[in-house]
Amino acid sequence: TDAVADGVHAISGVVDT
């Protein structure tokens, strides 16, 4: 996975976009 996508996922937390 892309680092950016991973970062966003971490920030999103429970919310998976």
UniProtKB/Swiss-Prot annotation:
It is found in: Secreted. Coiled coil: none annotated. GO terms for cellular component: extracellular region. Its main location: secreted. The keyword Nucleus does not apply. It comes from the Eukaryota. The keyword Secreted applies. Expressed in skin glands. Keywords: Secreted. Belongs to the Frog skin active peptide (FSAP) family. Septenin subfamily. May act as an antimicrobial peptide. This is Septenin 1f. It comes from Osteopilus septentrionalis.
